[in-house]
């Protein structure tokens, strides 16, 4: 059973990455959300609150909930996207962190519904390949989680049609890294595509990168956020 000290550590971790989201312009004002499993109690999740600006958010504002959605501790309401988080955790016991962003380039690609092909080594190593765009569903509904399930089956991230980015990982560190890399890849793809079709990494090389870099990362634990080369 988890302790208050463990909850506090998780809250501080979620807040740390929430502030980074704002600093890297992966979100704006109160958009987006982050969560992580409580390490010693996989049925508990620390998640950002609803309608709370990141620059004024405090550790105690982070809400502790069960994976069935019930609030365990916290004075604020959890994010309106809570079903997206809890249902993903229930479905995927290998997921320890979730990051949902509203970053500009990725939202542009998501609005077009075209996805991001495997054009960069860093995208494949961080996310497992090209990025699929899941069909549209209204934000805050369980349908979003259902529609992202197949898009995330063998990837660390997907785009939400007309919405944003959903990234997952064995830790919140991995999920944050994936979300950040997706935005960089989306920006590069849009810039390059404006001039000519963008060559993709060969399928056999994609599989090699997945096998040697992406897949092992799920078993290594925390990863310092980087943008990949």
For the regions a language model picked out, list residue spans one by one.
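Glycine-rich flexible loops
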Residues: 1-229
């Amino acid at each position: 059973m988890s302790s208050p000290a463990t909850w506090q550590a998780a809250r501080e971790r979620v807040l740390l990455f929430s502030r980074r989201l704002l600093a890297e312009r992966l979100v704006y004002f109160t958009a987006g959300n982050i969560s992580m499993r409580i390490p010693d109690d996989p049925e508990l999740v620390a998640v950002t609150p609803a309608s709370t600006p990141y620059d004024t958010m405090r550790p105690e504002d982070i809400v502790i909930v069960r994976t069935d959605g019930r609030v365990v501790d916290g004075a604020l309401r959890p994010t309106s996207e809570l079903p997206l988080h809890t249902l993903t955790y229930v479905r995927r016991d290998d997921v320890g962190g979730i990051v949902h962003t509203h970053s500009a380039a990725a939202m542009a690609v998501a609005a077009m519904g075209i996805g991001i092909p495997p054009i960069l080594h860093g995208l494949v190593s961080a996310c497992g390949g090209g990025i699929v765009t899941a069909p549209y569903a209204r934000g805050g509904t369980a349908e979003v989680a259902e529609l992202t399930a197949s898009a995330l089956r063998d990837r660390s991230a997907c785009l939400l049609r007309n919405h944003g980015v959903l990234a997952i990982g064995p830790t919140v560190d991995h999920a944050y890294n994936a979300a950040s890399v997706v935005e960089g890849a989306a920006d590069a793809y849009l810039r390059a595509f404006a001039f000519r079709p963008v060559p993709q990494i060969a399928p056999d090389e994609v599989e090699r990168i997945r096998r040697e870099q992406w897949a092992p990362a799920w078993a290594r634990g925390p990863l310092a956020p980087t943008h990949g080369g």
